[in-house]
C-alpha cells in the first residue's frame, strides 16, 4: 500500500498525485490539515528515517513557527512530545511524503518530488 501525505494546494504535491494517477498506481491520500494519522503509522514512517524526526519535520511551516519548533529546539522535546505534536498537527511534516508498506510492514519512504526517484514506485504495481 502506498500512502501520500500532501496538501492539495501544493504544486509539488500535485505532481506526486498526478504521477501515481498517470501510472495507474493506487494510493491512499492523506490530506495534511484535514486528516489524521495513527500513531503506529507515524512510528513506521520514523523507522524509515535515517535522522528520525529531523527527516520529516518542516521547520518552515506556520505550525512550526507558531509552536517555536526549530532545528535546534525540537531536540529538547521528548519522542512522546514530538509524536503528540505531529499527530495533533500534520502541518509540521514536510510534504509531499510518500510512504509505502509491503506485507503490512514499513518498506519505502520518499519526501518531496524527484522525477527519477519516484519511478521506483512503479515497481509497487508488480510487487503485489
Curated annotation (Swiss-Prot):
Record bears the keyword Oxidoreductase: yes
Signal peptide: none
MF-aspect GO terms: oxidoreductase activity
CDD domains named among the record's database cross-references: ArsC_Spx
Cystine bridges: 10-13
Keywords (A to Z) from UniProt: Disulfide bond, Oxidoreductase, Redox-active center
Pfam families xref list: ArsC (PF03960)
Top-level taxon of origin: Bacteria
Family statement: Belongs to the ArsC family.
Protein name in the entry: Uncharacterized protein UU176
Organism the protein comes from: Ureaplasma parvum serovar 3 (strain ATCC 700970)
Lineage: Bacteria, Bacillati, Mycoplasmatota, Mycoplasmoidales, Mycoplasmoidaceae
Amino acid at each position: 500500500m502506498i500512502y501520500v501525505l500532501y496538501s492539495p494546494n501544493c504544486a509539488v504535491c500535485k505532481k506526486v498525485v498526478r504521477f501515481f494517477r498517470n501510472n495507474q498506481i493506487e494510493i491512499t491520500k492523506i490530506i495534511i490539515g484535514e486528516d489524521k494519522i495513527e500513531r503506529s503509522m507515524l512510528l513506521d514512517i520514523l523507522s524509515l528515517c535515517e535522522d528520525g524526526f529531523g527527516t520529516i519535520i518542516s521547520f518552515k511551516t506556520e505550525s512550526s513557527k507558531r509552536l517555536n519548533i526549530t532545528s535546534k529546539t525540537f531536540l529538547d522535546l521528548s519522542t512522546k512530545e514530538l509524536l503528540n505534536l505531529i499527530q495533533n498537527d500534520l502541518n509540521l511534516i514536510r510534504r509531499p511524503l510518500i510512504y509505502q508498506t509491503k506485507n503490512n510492514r514499513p518498506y519505502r519512504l520518499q519526501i518531496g518530488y524527484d522525477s527519477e526517484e519516484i519511478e521506483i514506485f512503479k515497481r509497487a504495481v508488480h510487487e503485489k
